[in-house]
Structures are given as C-alpha cells and as structure tokens.
C-alpha cells in the first residue's frame, strides 16, 4: 500500500507526533510511506492508496481545509482519506460541512483501534514510537 502523510504548511519546528506514529504503523505493515508538508507538487501526479492529513490549531482552519481539498483528489478512493489531529478532534462537524469528508473519516481522540481505518489487527498506533 502507498501511504501519504500530510502536514499543512504550519510554522513549527517538529513534525507531528501523530503522523509519525502512523508512519511507524504502516512501515510495520510493509507499506510505502511518504511525508509531505504543505502543497508538495512532487506528489500531485501520483495516486495514493491512503492519505492521512493532520490538523493543529482552530485558527488554521482555512489552511487545513485548503490542504484537505488539495490532497483529497490524490487518493485512489475518497474513503481512504483520513483527517486527524487537534482541530479535527475539536471541530469534526465543521470539516464535514466545509470539506465534504464523511464524519467516519475524521479521526478524533486517540488512535488505539485500527478498525477505524478499515484495518484488522491488534496494533495500538498511539503506543508506537
């Protein structure tokens, strides 16, 4: 499986912990994983089996929605696009309304059960390094 991890173009020093744990999870499964920040045109001509996009602060809502709308067309099936992070946990219904993503594809809280992304294993992603 080809997995793309996306962080909107925030001004920060460290990569998002949640996406890094998801990276570890997919590498354990033997998947190809790529991380990008902001709008990375180098991945625009590729089709991805699964895309995860993180969100951070609520004041970055517009940037997050722009990022979601940019990358949602690069996933093989829109049902394999997942949005998570702090803002997604606080404002899931706003993302549903504005970006047209199904509520079940907005990951809120901890990522302890991989069945929420359609996987069937006992790995607790939040416990991974």
Question: Which residues are covered by each model-predicted region?
Answer:
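A short, structured N-terminal alpha-helical element that caps or precedes a catalytic domain
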Residues: 1-94, 98-102
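N-terminal [4Fe-4S]-dependent radical SAM core
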Residues: 1, 92-129
